[in-house]
Curated annotation (Swiss-Prot):
Belongs to the RdgC family. GO terms for molecular function: double-stranded DNA binding. May be involved in recombination. NCBIfam families: PRK00321.1-2, PRK00321.1-3, PRK00321.1-5. It comes from the Bacteria. It comes from Pseudomonas syringae pv. tomato (strain ATCC BAA-871 / DC3000). This is Recombination-associated protein RdgC.
């Protein structure tokens, strides 16, 4: 269990996450299949294992792991539009009258309801790790919408979840721009070979660089003409690499072989043991990595009144 992306949320109050109570709460909203006329469903699933006996909360040391699954029927807009046009054309030709918006909308709804039972179904899972002692919830997603779906559903079942996206005192873009300009990152961080540069003016240009020497004159010229770094590939110690963006989203997390080998050794031969060992080692690594990342970005910002 290695996260590939990271959206970081700060608990603004102490929340007593009791694993047994959380298990009971999540069980009130389990994931389920879409009924024939349902567009989507959302609920909690076991992060590890399958079957009714698999726990909805995985506990390892002081960390909790939960997962939610979305099931949705995929109905392409083009299919609906084509069917609607065909129906409207048929009515207008046969009845020699114009089909106006209200009737068109009603026809569209009827077409959707007729097509839904035959639509393809897509399933997607989102994982979140809760670190109560650190006051953090870490969501394995790069889309804030996907993370908010999980957090809002968690809030729904436990009654209250005082949480906000974690922010830092210095703009990540300003810090990353400085690192590339000075060709030196913060301690334990190393600039790699990929970045995105954007012009600060509205409708300004975007430059995306991959497998490129970011110390080159070409990159420096872009920075000197006013562009700023909005995405940057980085490494931390010899343990992980990632891409950081200007919204404080950590993407394309990759844990180095040394960590993965250690988890494999710790986990034994059973699949569940391997998953537990990798999750534990990942969370312990985050316990070192995240405070250093926050410090490198000027320190965590604590909004007034919190």
């Amino acid at each position: 269990m290695w996260f590939k992306n990271l959206l970081i949320y700060r608990l603004t109050q102490d929340v007593p996450f009791d694993a047994e109570a959380l298990e009971t709460a999540l069980a009130t909203k389990p994931a389920r299949a879409c009924a024939s006329q349902e567009v989507a469903t959302y609920g909690f699933v076991a992060p590890f294992g399958k079957g009714e006996d698999a726990p909805l909360v995985h506990i390892s040391q002081d960390f909790l792991l939960i997962a939610a699954r979305k099931e949705e029927r995929i109905l392409p807009g083009s299919v609906v539009r084509d069917a609607l046009k065909e129906k409207v054309d048929e009515i207008e030709a046969e009845q020699m009258r114009k089909v106006y918006k209200k009737e068109r909308d009603q026809l569209k709804d009827e077409i959707i309801q007729a097509f839904l039972p035959r639509a393809f179904i897509r399933r997607s899972a989102t994982f979140a790790a809760i670190a109560p002692r650190q006051g953090l919830i870490l969501v394995n997603a790069s889309s804030p919408k996907r993370a908010e779906d999980l957090l809002s559903t968690l809030r729904e079942v436990i009654g209250s979840l005082p949480v906000r996206p974690l922010t830092v005192k210095v703009s990540p873009s300003a810090t990353m721009t400085d690192w590339v300009k000075t060709q030196k990152a913060a301690d334990n961080f190393f600039v790699l070979d990929e970045c995105e540069l954007r012009d600060t003016h509205e409708d300004g240009g975007i430059v995306r660089c991959k497998r490129q020497d970011l110390t080159s004159d070409e990159i420096q010229l872009h920075l000197n003409t006013g562009k700023v770094v909005t995405q940057l590939s980085l490494a931390w110690q010899d343990k992980l690499s990632f891409v950081l963006d200007d919204k404080m989203v950590v993407k394309r997390l990759k844990f180095e072989d040394l960590l993965q080998d250690q988890a494999e050794q710790d986990g034994g031969e059973e699949a569940l043991g391997q998953l537990d060992a990798s999750f534990t080692l990942m969370m312990l690594t985050f316990g070192e990595f995240l405070p250093e990342l926050f410090e490198a970005l000027g320190g965590e910002e604590i909004p007034q009144g919190i």
